[in-house]
Design a protein with these regions (language model features):
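Asparagine-centered polar/low-complexity signal
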Residues: 6, 111, 178-181
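Glycine-rich anion-binding loops of enzyme active sites
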Residues: 2-96
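Short acidic/polar active-site loop segments enriched in Thr and Asp
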Residues: 1-2, 124
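Glycine-/charge-enriched secondary-structure boundary and capping motifs
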Residues: 13-36, 43-50, 120-121, 126-181
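Short hydrophobic/aromatic-rich motifs at helix boundaries and adjacent loops
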Residues: 84-88, 107-112, 135
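Active-site glycine-rich loop that binds ribose-phosphate moieties when present
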Residues: 53-63, 98-118
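Glycine- and other small-residue-rich loops at beta-strand/loop junctions that grip anionic moieties
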Residues: 41, 67, 78, 103, ...
């Protein structure tokens, strides 16, 4: 990465100290990745949201797309699953800070180690697991690669409480649109 732009939505009644702390955390992460923040955009919103739009370059042989998976490839996950489920539960006070903290720590962790390992292993295809979850993103990758996959569900790394929360129907809003997809 070379440069990043902040994208912050925050209730203005929280004051500038909260915004400053969030933006400083983002700047620290961007610096850790070897880039700098050149600006961004903020909006007043009841629900806090923060992200970065990151710009950079990569060598052609280091670009891995979500198409190109081949029969026999293994699926590697670099972080546990269940971020959306656990954060949805936190928003409605169904879990405590002790269950939320590992999720926050994971979201703050850079993906650089996984990226380097993926390139070194000459990975055929990759995807991120974000709003559409593993099912949605894996489906997209497999469809683009004209492949199928067998998942050993019990071996999937999950955040504490994620499975029980899912069974209790505490799921992020996108869950059911992913099922329709």
């Amino acid at each position: 990465p070379h440069v990043a732009l902040n994208l912050l939505a925050l209730d203005s009644s929280l004051g500038t100290d909260v915004a400053t702390a969030i933006l400083q955390g983002g700047a620290d992460a961007v610096s850790q990745a070897g880039a700098f923040v050149s600006g961004g955009h903020t909006i007043d919103d009841d629900e806090p949201k923060y992200g970065l739009s990151v710009f950079g370059t990569a060598a052609a042989n280091a670009v891995v797309r979500n198409a190109g998976a081949q029969p026999g490839d293994k699926l590697y996950l670099t972080k546990p699953l269940g971020v959306g489920i656990v954060t949805a539960a936190a928003r409605i006070d169904c879990i405590g800070q002790e269950d939320l903290r590992p999720v926050i720590d994971s979201m703050m962790e850079l993906n650089s180690a996984g990226s380097k390992a993926m390139v070194a292993a000459a990975t055929h295809a990759a995807t991120d697991v974000t709003g559409f979850g593993l099912a949605g993103h894996l489906h997209e990758m497999l469809e683009a690669s004209n492949c199928s996959a067998v998942i050993d569900f019990p071996s999937l790394p999950l955040f504490s409480q994620a499975w029980q929360l899912c069974c209790d129907y505490c799921r992020p809003g996108r869950t059911f649109s992913t099922i329709e997809y």
